[in-house]
């Protein structure tokens, strides 16, 4: 259970104050010898993190500490500091605010809107967890700074920032909801960080937990309108990147801000807003760059509306966020946007000075995994970057530490407060999802397969949608001991329900709060028209309806929710976890294939092709024989994603051709003829097996012409007939992602100590 600190008697700690002149004997201070210009502010706050640990004659060098990915956060080494540099120039004085925490490490910091206080994340020693603290930036009458601990408990709280109205946002790996702490759905080894807030005065007594994502949400930053942005690791099937989202301080209205529809790099991290909907941050590869990369500007303004281009304009009644057409400018063009060694170093954690200049950390050298291999940490110091001359002006660099997270200590305008109703609503209250008109879309995509013999625009295809399938996502937190859900990049999946599309194109559904979902509009044949590549979620009682299927949020005539009556009434899709429809292969699919298909398609009738792999370490050569079409339960051993697995022959036969097409089989040799892609994850309409079976709709029409695609196995005799439900079962297992494992066949047990059950959330 979470241990709370009484907010009225929050732990107060004091440290010595550093003075620019007449330094007291207890102050830990350093002056730089380099020359540099004035930053235009009196002080900057920054963090120091340790890379070299000396213990007697033993020296340990920690470059990334296993935190190779930009969203990782658990790199602890003792001896870090939270400092102020004052005056904010190269000959200024460094004062350590956390001097008595000699074994601490720090994980994010921010300065209050009035410039009098800082918030930071600190892990005091190796037996502690990262928690949130505040510190006064003005010494009291005794010449001391006061530190107050704001969070506690058996979880890590990191990356804190100030929000309007006296709140603090941060990322946490606290367990909540029956699913517990999420395990990232890509490597299944990281404890996923979610978003939360507390109040400055109340700390944990006012803790509120946000709707979840399947992978990390980190690095929040304040936005002009009172919301806050953050970096979100998105993994949904083939999507695997870090993009920018925003949310209200109450945990509602999670929306994309940029990077969803293209960006110059895989990952965007550590953004700060320069002006409304214009941000600077780091663009880089998701891993192998030590949280560093190129400086990138992202402009998510609606350029079609002149009002939105005025930084001081009144945006009331204007849709000024246009994430679909976000524009990117790489400010450091010589820095690679991938994980290649950099010829000019890499940047970390930029912020913005009042005059618009960029204050950032920078290190020379390759700044990638070559540093780890050579056990040579990059030397991050603090600089001002000139985007015109492409030069760095040194502010401060202590070569014994990484100098990070530099922020100007200066008052700034506090954004407006966004009202929060989440804490007044029961935690189990459903969210409302739906569309005004599903066929309304701004996406420039086409759909092909089945009845679409040639590609048609998405908007045209959506006019034939009869329902929307709502799919819950989960990862290995729900399937213990499972690191892959099968021969697929997709996560675990459960169908919450299928909502009908009404005559006006509308649909509505009530769905559980907090969990991740994505949507599939389906046609009269039960085939997905499109697979949404973005997780959506909502807080209890939240209205998350949309205009259409990714309809434009800008321009004239865009309807607003609540003002447009629709025919649809909300379907109830709030069943308990054991009652949700999952399609695990051993229990749902194999019995069907054994009964109806394996009599003709088995080990005695199939041909084989082979995959040969040479182990790069041992040199051992292994050959795997893959059946072309064996729909029996015969065990087959296969190699996939650097692991060896055993699955039923039917599962391997149907999905392995699509697995090979993913291009993830480096260092292997294929011998023989690979069959067609019988079953394609997320794409039943283009799967060869579905075209072989054919599908009949309720109106008697077929997905494929019967002249070329007679119904199978019915063409082999009535005794082999598949029912419509059996055909739909096969379609769903493909459209959901081709998962072998599910909660229902891995012994999932819900987490029962759910703190969101309290009304305070």
Residues covered by each model-derived region:
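Bacterial Sec-dependent N-terminal signal peptides
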Residues: 17-41, 558-566, 761
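Bacterial N-terminal signal peptides that target proteins for export
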Residues: 1-12
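General secretory precursor processing signal
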Residues: 19, 29, 323, 549, ...
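Sequence signature of WD/YWTD-type beta-propeller architectures
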Residues: 27-504, 510, 531, 535, ...
């Amino acid at each position: 259970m979470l241990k709370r600190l009484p907010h009225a008697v929050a732990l107060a700690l004091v440290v010595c104050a550093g003075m620019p002149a007449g330094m007291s004997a207890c102050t830990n201070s350093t002056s730089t010898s380099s020359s540099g210009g004035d930053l235009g502010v009196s002080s900057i706050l920054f963090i120091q993190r340790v890379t070299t640990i000396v213990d007697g004659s033993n020296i340990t060098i920690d470059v990334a500490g296993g935190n190779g990915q930009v969203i990782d956060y658990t790199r602890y080494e003792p001896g870090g500091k939270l400092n102020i540099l004052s005056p904010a120039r190269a000959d200024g004085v460094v004062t350590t605010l956390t001097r008595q925490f000699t074994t601490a490490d720090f994980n994010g910091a921010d300065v209050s809107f009035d410039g009098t206080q800082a918030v930071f994340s600190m892990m005091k020693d190796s037996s502690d967890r990262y928690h949130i603290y505040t510190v006064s930036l003005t010494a009291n009458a005794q010449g001391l700074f006061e530190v107050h601990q704001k969070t506690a408990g058996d979880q890590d709280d990191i990356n804190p920032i100030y929000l309007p109205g006296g709140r603090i946002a941060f990322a946490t790996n606290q367990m909540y909801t029956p699913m517990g702490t999420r395990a990232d759905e890509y490597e299944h080894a990281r404890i996923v960080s979610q978003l939360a807030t507390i109040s400055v005065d109340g700390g944990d007594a006012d803790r509120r937990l946000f709707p979840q994502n399947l992978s990390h949400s980190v690095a929040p930053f304040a936005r002009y309108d009172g919301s806050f942005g953050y970096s979100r690791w998105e993994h949904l099937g083939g999507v695997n990147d870090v993009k920018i989202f925003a949310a209200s301080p109450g945990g509602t209205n999670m929306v994309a801000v940029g990077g969803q529809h293209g960006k110059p790099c895989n990952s965007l991290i550590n953004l700060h807003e320069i002006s409304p909907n214009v941000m600077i941050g780091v663009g880089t590869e998701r891993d192998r760059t030590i949280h560093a990369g190129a400086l990138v500007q992202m402009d998510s303004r609606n350029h079609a509306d002149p009002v939105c281009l005025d930084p001081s304009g009144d945006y009331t009644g204007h849709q000024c966020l246009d994430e679909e057409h976000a524009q990117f400018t790489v400010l450091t063009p010589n820095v690679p946007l991938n994980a290649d060694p950099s010829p000019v170093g890499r940047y970390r954690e930029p912020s913005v000075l009042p005059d618009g200049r960029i204050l950032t950390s920078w290190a020379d050298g390759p700044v990638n995994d070559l540093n780890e291999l050579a056990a040579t940490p990059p030397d991050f110091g603090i600089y001002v970057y000139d985007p015109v001359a492409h030069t760095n002006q040194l502010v401060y660099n202590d070569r014994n530490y990484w100098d990070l997270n530099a922020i100007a200590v200066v008052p700034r305008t506090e954004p407006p407060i966004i009202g929060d109703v989440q804490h007044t609503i029961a935690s189990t209250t459903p969210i409302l999802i739906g569309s005004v008109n599903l066929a309304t879309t701004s996406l420039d995509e086409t759909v092909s397969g089945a009845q679409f013999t040639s590609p048609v625009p998405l908007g045209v295809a959506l006019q034939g949608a009869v329902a929307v399938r709502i799919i819950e996502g989960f990862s290995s937190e729900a399937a213990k001991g499972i690191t892959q859900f099968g021969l697929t990049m997709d996560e675990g999946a459960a169908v919450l329900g299928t909502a009908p599309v009404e005559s006006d194109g509308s649909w509505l559904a009530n769905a559980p709060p907090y969990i991740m979902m994505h949507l599939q509009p389906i046609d009269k044949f039960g085939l997905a028209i499109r697979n949404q590549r973005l997780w959506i979620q909502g807080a209890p009682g939240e209205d998350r309806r949309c205009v259409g299927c990714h309809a434009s949020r800008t321009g004239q005539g865009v309807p607003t929710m609540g003002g447009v009556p629709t025919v649809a009434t909300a379907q109830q899709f709030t069943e308990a976890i054991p009652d949700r429809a999952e399609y695990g292969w051993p229990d749902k699919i194999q019995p069907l294939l054994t009964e109806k298909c394996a009599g003709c398609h088995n080990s005695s009738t199939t041909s084989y092709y082979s995959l040969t792999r040479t182990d790069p370490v041992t040199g051992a050569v292994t050959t795997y024989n893959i059946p072309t079409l064996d729909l029996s339960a015969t065990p087959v051993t296969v190699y996939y994603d650097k692991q060896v697995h055993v699955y039923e022959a039917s599962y391997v036969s149907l999905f392995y051709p699509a697995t090979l097409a993913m291009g993830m089989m480096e260092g292997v040799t294929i011998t023989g003829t690979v069959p067609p892609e019988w079953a394609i994850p997320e794409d039943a309409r283009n799967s060869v097996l579905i075209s072989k079976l054919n599908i009949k709709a309720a109106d008697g029409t077929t997905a494929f012409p019967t002249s070329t695609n007679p119904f199978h196995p019915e063409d082999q005799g009535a005794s082999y007939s598949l029912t419509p439900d059996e055909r739909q079962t096969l379609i769903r297992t493909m459209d959901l992602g081709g998962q072998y494992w599910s909660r229902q066949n891995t012994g999932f047990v819900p987490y029962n100590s759910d703190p969101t059950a309290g009304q305070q959330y």
